[in-house]
Amino acid sequence: MSVDELPSSLRPASLSDWDAGRSMGRLIVAWQHPTLRLISPVGVLEHGPTGYRFRYLRRARELAGFQPFLDFPAWHGDYRDERLFPLFAQRIMSPRRPDFRHFLDQLDLSPDASPWEQLARSGGRSEGDTLQVFPAPVVEADGSTACMFLVSGIRYCNGGVLPHLAVGDRLELRDEPGNSANPEALHVCVAGQPIGWIPDLMIDYVRTSRRSGPVLLTVVHVNGSDAPAHLRVLVRLEGTVPPGYQPMAGPGWETFVID
């Protein structure tokens, strides 16, 4: 089964209520090589009316250096649970922590945000870890599309120092063909000044949107320098894609287990 063949109960309802993980849907689970730092998709985490489901992508078995997660030892496993799996639940901050509300503010989430929302918005990253998740962008029937994501690699641009940014500011995209790690990389810029990059897993989607028409990239939320670098800038992208295109789906995104 390809991840674009999800049952309707697992598909985000619409752009208006999706908002980077507010509704049930799917997250792409990615692994970062500990030395090469390359980020690759390895699995799909789904959230539906009956609970949670995890399956590996077929491509994960061919990924140099990657081994199945201890919680999910079998490539062909079809893992299901009414509760969020511990591997992902441990990446969600406990509401008992005194800094819980501050953490939600950094993610631009409401106080009643669900664990799924936290995971989708934050990416589930932790210090020294190699796992993160990405919400799959929504595409409407007319080809319009939107998604929110955190700007990547801010610490590597201008020493992590950001220019003045305000909610609603327009941002620019700039090609970086000289990037030795990924010639397809896209800089996120303010008045021509790079502040970071589009996350690697979003590049195909963003480039497809650019080829299909105008793309609007705006600032949704900005955190101060006390926030982790990967949480500094939350942005929203709006555009269109060709008929039939589904991000993070199709060839190369098939799972081992089919329904």
Range-by-range predicted roles:
Residues 2-259:
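Conserved active-site motif detector
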